[in-house]
Amino acid sequence: MQLLEERILTDGNILGENILKVDNFLTHQVDYRSMKAIGKVFAQKYAEAGITKVVTIEASGIAPAVYAAEAMDVPMIFAKKHKNITMTEGILTAEVYSFTKQVTSTVSIAGKFLSKEDKVLIIDDFLANGQAAKGLIEIIGQAGAQVVGVGIVIEKSFQDGRRLIEDMGIEVTSLARIKNFENGNLNFLEADA
């Protein structure tokens, strides 16, 4: 997605050897116009897939996921990273390791929001090692629902996340694919959409 790549080059900051900070439009402050455009691209890509739910993980995946759900006219569910006292029964859970935060969390979704009839599109802000997507795939599987695809805003293609998901037989659609960080710059691979 050309618009997204341009935005990353303009507003992204490289931290160290493998961290991209995009907090001014995606991970802290949200540029709703960009998120709306991203949501439309995912909706067009999966228009014929019969998607019934969009699922993400809190927090930075929520903005692109809600705009994708809006464009598809389906509900959006986000997995919670912290136990909530109001979630008392029928909870679906998985362990997820966060590359950025260097911590493992138990993420959860109330089972009443997913059924075996659902066709789910997972949306997330970043794909690095694939652990967030893997955890969501496990949760969706516990409900008997089908994961149709995983939509990623920014993929770090030099890490193993794509391979992990594709080895599970699930399609990955990334709107920006980073090949590497080199001398304070980043290089892109061709995006999936």
From Swiss-Prot:
Annotated localization: Cytoplasm
The entry's xanthine-binding residues are L20, T27, K156
State the coiled-coil residue ranges: none
Assembly, per entry: Homodimer.
Query: Which molecular-function annotations from GO does this UniProt entry contain?
Result: xanthine phosphoribosyltransferase activity
Which EC numbers does the record give?
Answer: 2.4.2.22
Q: What class of enzyme is it?
A: transferase
Q: Which protein, by its recorded name, is this?
A: Xanthine phosphoribosyltransferase
Q: Which GO terms describe its biological process?
A: purine ribonucleoside salvage; xanthine metabolic process; XMP salvage
Q: Which reaction does it catalyse?
A: XMP + diphosphate = xanthine + 5-phospho-alpha-D-ribose 1-diphosphate
For this UniProt record, the keywords arranged alphabetically read as follows: Cytoplasm, Glycosyltransferase, Purine salvage, Transferase
A GO cellular-component term linked to this record: cytoplasm
Here the disulfide bonds are: none
Where is it mainly found? cytoplasm
Tell me the protein family, please: Belongs to the purine/pyrimidine phosphoribosyltransferase family. Xpt subfamily.
| NCBIfam families per UniProt | PRK09219.1, XPRTase
Pathway per the UniProt entry: Purine metabolism; XMP biosynthesis via salvage pathway; XMP from xanthine: step 1/1
**Chain residues that bind 5-phospho-alpha-D-ribose 1-diphosphate:** A128, N129, G130, Q131, A132
